[in-house]
Amino acid sequence: MKMVLSQRQREELNQAIADYLGSNGYGDSLETFRKEADVSTESEKKFGGLLEKKWTSVIRLQKKVMELEAKLTEAEKEVIEGAPTKNKRTPGEWIPRPPEKYSLTGHRASITRVIFHPIFGLMVSASEDATIKIWDFETGEYERSLKGHTDSVQDVAFDSQGKLLASCSADLSIKLWDFQQSYECVKTMHGHDHNVSSVAFVPAGDYVLSASRDRTIKMWEVATGYCVKTYTGHREWVRMVRVHIEGSIFATCSNDHTIRVWLMNSKDCKVELRDHEHTVECIAWAPEAAASAINEAAGADNKKGHHQGPFLASGSRDKTIRIWDVSVGLCLLTLNGHDNWVRGLAFHPGGKYLVSASDDKTIRVWDLRNKRCMKTLYAHQHFCTSIDFHKAHPYVISGSVDQTVKVWECR
């Protein structure tokens, strides 16, 4: 479609082009253009840099238009599918929606873990580049890097107050970082014989648990840095350790296709969960708020009455997500939909939904009550490796092999 400019607009555009040619040293072109466009040799100051300003404005507007179009497509889809629209959704129904609010770059290798700070508006990313980076998730600003590991940082975890950060690495060490003032490493613990793949604080904050490729889980005293307990039982690499909020039990998952739930105060395995057909990559404890949705979903499959829990979700290389009642060692439901390994899980604080990250490059939102995938976000250019859901603010973060960390707003 031909755009029609008024005489004045045409003259101003010609002046701006002449200014651009002159200021960038295109003398011959400028002379020819002045003759053909009848532009005076005395360029006014107001035309200085005007063409560049207009060009950058167009690019900014184009980006805004694309974002609005994505949101409009999203809204139209919801109307067609009959999902509650934004005005009708309560905060308990808010889920991550495209496009991402921020795409954060700075790491020089794959992202291995992303987590929110429990109190401040900060998030932390760990990477195979051996660094940990701190970001402000509300502004998308980079804050600082924590350096000290000499190999891939595999996992990070905060204590309940967010005063200490624990990290573990393929360099066989676990480090504790002061997250209040100095942001320096205050302790380094050694004891594992192979890659340390996961780390978690117990709720009281006085102990840290670590899981390793050496097939063991170790408990470390924060005050002294000493290993006080070693749990054995897995037959292969222990991928992840996660502590239940009450602090009396914790769960681990492994390349041996099993999940084990352990008693914190002894070295005993309370229950072994078997049903996955491949390596179990990730686990997540369900909040109390999820109990009713899980029970309702399980009701169709299990005619055994009300399940007490606690409930645990697991994601595997067999592409499935399973929800377990660990008190009886029973798999209550299986969620199918991912086309590749499931690498990360996080429950919605309201308990209705579970979000998952996968090597199929997507984030999926699962409606637990109806046992279905209600939204798929094509999140990254490469495998999605980690995901976290903020407990108080409407944000989800994801990390990927594409070296980016993305912040998703929930609405």
Swiss-Prot record:
Residues 56-83 form a coiled coil. GO terms for biological process: border follicle cell migration; centrosome localization; centrosome separation; chorion-containing eggshell pattern formation; clathrin-dependent endocytosis involved in vitellogenesis; dendrite morphogenesis; establishment of mitotic spindle orientation; germarium-derived cystoblast division. It is found in: Cytoplasm, Cytoskeleton; Cytoplasm, Cytoskeleton, Microtubule organizing center, Centrosome. Transmembrane segments: none annotated. Residues 9-41 form the LisH domain. It comes from the Eukaryota. SUPFAM superfamilies: Lissencephaly-1 protein (Lis-1, PAF-AH alpha) N-terminal domain, WD40 repeat-like. The keyword Repeat applies. InterPro entries: Dynein_regulator_LIS1, G-protein_beta_WD-40_rep, LIS1_N, LisH, PAC1-like_LisH-like_dom, WD40/YVTN_repeat-like_dom_sf, WD40_repeat_CS, WD40_repeat_dom_sf. The keyword Coiled coil applies. CDD domains: WD40. Belongs to the WD repeat LIS1/nudF family. Positively regulates the activity of the minus-end directed microtubule motor protein dynein. May enhance dynein-mediated microtubule sliding by targeting dynein to the microtubule plus end. Required for several dynein- and microtubule-dependent processes. This is Lissencephaly-1 homolog. The lineage of its organism: Eukaryota, Metazoa, Ecdysozoa, Arthropoda, Hexapoda.
